[in-house]
Protein backbone atom coordinates (compact mmCIF):
# COMPACT_ATOMS: atom_id res chain seq x y z
CA UNK A 1 0.00 0.00 0.00
CA UNK A 2 2.86 2.36 0.78
CA UNK A 3 4.30 1.76 -2.69
CA UNK A 4 0.92 2.79 -4.11
CA UNK A 5 1.23 6.18 -2.42
CA UNK A 6 -0.89 5.54 0.67
CA UNK A 7 0.72 6.86 3.87
CA UNK A 8 1.89 4.25 6.40
CA UNK A 9 -0.47 5.55 9.08
CA UNK A 10 -3.45 5.06 6.80
CA UNK A 11 -2.22 1.55 5.94
CA UNK A 12 -2.26 0.66 9.63
CA UNK A 13 -5.74 2.11 10.11
CA UNK A 14 -7.08 0.18 7.10
CA UNK A 15 -5.56 -3.07 8.36
CA UNK A 16 -7.08 -2.43 11.82
CA UNK A 17 -10.55 -2.28 10.25
CA UNK A 18 -10.25 -5.96 9.35
CA UNK A 19 -9.45 -7.18 12.88
CA UNK A 20 -12.66 -8.65 14.35
CA UNK A 21 -13.40 -7.25 17.78
CA UNK A 22 -17.07 -7.89 18.48
CA UNK A 23 -18.99 -10.55 16.59
CA UNK A 24 -22.73 -10.88 17.37
CA UNK A 25 -22.40 -9.37 20.83
CA UNK A 26 -19.58 -11.68 21.93
CA UNK A 27 -16.06 -10.50 22.52
CA UNK A 28 -13.58 -12.21 20.24
CA UNK A 29 -11.09 -13.96 22.52
CA UNK A 30 -8.60 -14.53 19.69
CA UNK A 31 -8.29 -10.77 19.28
CA UNK A 32 -7.61 -10.35 23.00
CA UNK A 33 -4.98 -13.08 22.87
CA UNK A 34 -3.33 -11.31 19.93
CA UNK A 35 -3.50 -7.99 21.75
CA UNK A 36 -1.87 -9.38 24.91
CA UNK A 37 0.78 -11.13 22.83
CA UNK A 38 1.92 -8.07 20.88
CA UNK A 39 1.38 -5.37 23.53
CA UNK A 40 4.87 -5.56 25.14
CA UNK A 41 6.51 -5.68 21.71
CA UNK A 42 4.55 -2.62 20.56
CA UNK A 43 5.04 -0.65 23.80
CA UNK A 44 8.75 -1.26 24.26
CA UNK A 45 10.01 -1.61 20.69
CA UNK A 46 7.64 -0.38 17.97
CA UNK A 47 6.49 2.89 19.60
CA UNK A 48 9.98 4.05 20.67
CA UNK A 49 11.32 3.15 17.23
CA UNK A 50 8.44 5.05 15.60
CA UNK A 51 9.13 8.12 17.74
CA UNK A 52 12.85 8.04 17.00
CA UNK A 53 12.38 7.55 13.26
CA UNK A 54 9.87 10.41 13.07
CA UNK A 55 12.05 12.75 15.13
CA UNK A 56 14.15 13.51 12.07
CA UNK A 57 17.58 12.84 13.56
CA UNK A 58 20.08 12.46 10.74
CA UNK A 59 22.57 9.81 11.80
CA UNK A 60 24.97 10.62 8.96
CA UNK A 61 25.47 14.14 10.40
CA UNK A 62 25.62 12.94 14.00
CA UNK A 63 28.74 13.56 16.07
CA UNK A 64 29.35 13.41 19.79
CA UNK A 65 30.94 16.86 19.67
CA UNK A 66 27.67 18.40 18.45
CA UNK A 67 25.85 16.84 21.41
CA UNK A 68 28.28 18.49 23.84
CA UNK A 69 27.37 22.04 22.84
CA UNK A 70 25.82 24.69 25.08
CA UNK A 71 22.72 24.65 22.85
CA UNK A 72 22.21 20.95 23.46
CA UNK A 73 22.76 21.22 27.22
CA UNK A 74 20.37 24.18 27.35
CA UNK A 75 17.60 22.22 25.65
CA UNK A 76 18.19 19.15 27.84
CA UNK A 77 18.17 21.23 31.04
CA UNK A 78 15.13 23.18 29.86
CA UNK A 79 13.13 20.02 29.33
CA UNK A 80 14.41 18.13 32.35
CA UNK A 81 14.81 20.86 34.99
CA UNK A 82 12.85 23.78 33.55
CA UNK A 83 9.55 22.00 33.08
CA UNK A 84 9.41 20.47 36.56
CA UNK A 85 10.63 23.70 38.15
CA UNK A 86 8.02 25.74 36.28
CA UNK A 87 5.16 23.42 37.20
CA UNK A 88 6.14 23.28 40.87
CA UNK A 89 6.91 27.02 41.25
CA UNK A 90 3.51 27.88 39.78
CA UNK A 91 1.45 25.16 41.50
CA UNK A 92 2.79 25.38 45.05
CA UNK A 93 1.82 29.03 45.68
CA UNK A 94 -1.57 28.45 44.04
CA UNK A 95 -2.31 25.63 46.49
CA UNK A 96 -0.90 27.51 49.50
CA UNK A 97 -3.00 30.63 48.72
CA UNK A 98 -6.12 28.44 48.21
CA UNK A 99 -6.58 29.24 44.53
CA UNK A 100 -6.79 25.48 44.00
CA UNK A 101 -6.11 22.25 45.88
CA UNK A 102 -4.34 18.99 45.26
CA UNK A 103 -6.62 16.07 44.41
CA UNK A 104 -7.53 13.87 47.37
CA UNK A 105 -4.97 11.19 48.24
CA UNK A 106 -2.26 13.13 46.38
CA UNK A 107 0.95 14.15 48.11
CA UNK A 108 3.39 16.79 46.94
CA UNK A 109 5.81 14.02 46.00
CA UNK A 110 3.21 12.39 43.75
CA UNK A 111 2.44 15.77 42.22
CA UNK A 112 6.16 16.35 41.70
CA UNK A 113 6.44 13.05 39.83
CA UNK A 114 3.79 14.30 37.41
CA UNK A 115 5.64 17.62 37.08
CA UNK A 116 8.77 15.70 36.08
CA UNK A 117 6.82 13.92 33.35
CA UNK A 118 6.00 17.35 31.92
CA UNK A 119 9.51 17.32 30.47
CA UNK A 120 8.50 14.65 27.98
CA UNK A 121 7.11 17.41 25.73
CA UNK A 122 8.62 15.68 22.73
CA UNK A 123 6.27 16.71 19.92
CA UNK A 124 5.90 20.38 20.78
CA UNK A 125 9.62 20.72 21.49
CA UNK A 126 10.47 19.29 18.08
CA UNK A 127 7.88 21.56 16.45
CA UNK A 128 9.24 24.72 18.07
CA UNK A 129 12.84 23.64 17.47
CA UNK A 130 12.01 22.92 13.84
CA UNK A 131 10.72 26.45 13.41
CA UNK A 132 13.73 27.92 15.21
CA UNK A 133 16.46 25.89 13.50
CA UNK A 134 15.38 25.23 9.93
CA UNK A 135 17.88 22.70 8.56
CA UNK A 136 21.59 22.53 9.28
CA UNK A 137 23.63 21.18 12.16
CA UNK A 138 21.81 22.99 15.02
CA UNK A 139 18.61 21.31 13.88
CA UNK A 140 20.09 17.83 14.34
CA UNK A 141 21.63 18.76 17.71
CA UNK A 142 18.29 20.17 18.82
CA UNK A 143 16.51 16.94 17.90
CA UNK A 144 19.05 14.80 19.79
CA UNK A 145 18.77 17.13 22.81
CA UNK A 146 14.97 16.85 22.81
CA UNK A 147 15.21 13.06 22.76
CA UNK A 148 17.75 13.04 25.62
CA UNK A 149 15.76 15.56 27.70
CA UNK A 150 12.53 13.65 27.17
CA UNK A 151 14.18 10.34 28.07
CA UNK A 152 15.70 11.82 31.24
CA UNK A 153 12.31 13.20 32.26
CA UNK A 154 10.57 9.89 31.58
CA UNK A 155 13.13 7.78 33.44
CA UNK A 156 13.41 10.10 36.47
CA UNK A 157 9.61 10.47 36.59
CA UNK A 158 9.20 6.70 36.63
CA UNK A 159 11.77 6.38 39.44
CA UNK A 160 9.99 8.99 41.58
CA UNK A 161 6.60 7.38 40.89
CA UNK A 162 7.93 3.97 41.92
CA UNK A 163 9.32 5.51 45.10
CA UNK A 164 5.89 7.06 45.82
CA UNK A 165 4.11 3.72 45.45
CA UNK A 166 6.70 1.81 47.53
CA UNK A 167 6.67 4.36 50.37
CA UNK A 168 2.98 3.64 51.15
Curated annotation (Swiss-Prot):
Q: What GO molecular-function term can you cite, just one?
A: sodium:proton antiporter activity
Q: How does it sit in the membrane?
A: Multi-pass membrane protein
Q: What is this protein called?
A: Putative Na(+)/H(+) antiporter NhaA homolog
The processes (GO biological process) annotated in the record are:
regulation of pH
The family classification in the record reads: Belongs to the NhaA Na(+)/H(+) (TC 2.A.33) antiporter family.
Q: Where are the transmembrane segments?
A: 1-21, 37-57, 70-90, 111-131, 144-164
Gene of this entry: nhaA
PANTHER family the UniProt entry points to: NA(+)_H(+) ANTIPORTER NHAA, SODIUM ION/PROTON ANTIPORTER NHAA-RELATED
Q: Which GO terms describe its cellular component?
A: plasma membrane
Listed A to Z, the keywords are:
Cell inner membrane, Cell membrane, Membrane, Transmembrane, Transmembrane helix
Which Pfam family name is an example for this entry? Na_H_antiport_1
Main location as per UniProt:
membrane
Q: Where in the cell is it found?
A: Cell inner membrane
The cross-references to InterPro entries, in alphabetical order and at most eight, read: Na/H_antiporter_dom_sf (IPR023171), NhaA (IPR004670)
The organism's superkingdom is given as Bacteria
Amino acid sequence: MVEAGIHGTLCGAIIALFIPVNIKGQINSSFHKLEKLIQPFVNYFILPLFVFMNSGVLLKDFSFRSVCSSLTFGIILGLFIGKQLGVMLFSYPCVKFNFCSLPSNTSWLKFYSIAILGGIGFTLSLFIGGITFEGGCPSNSMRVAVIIGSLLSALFGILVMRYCTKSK
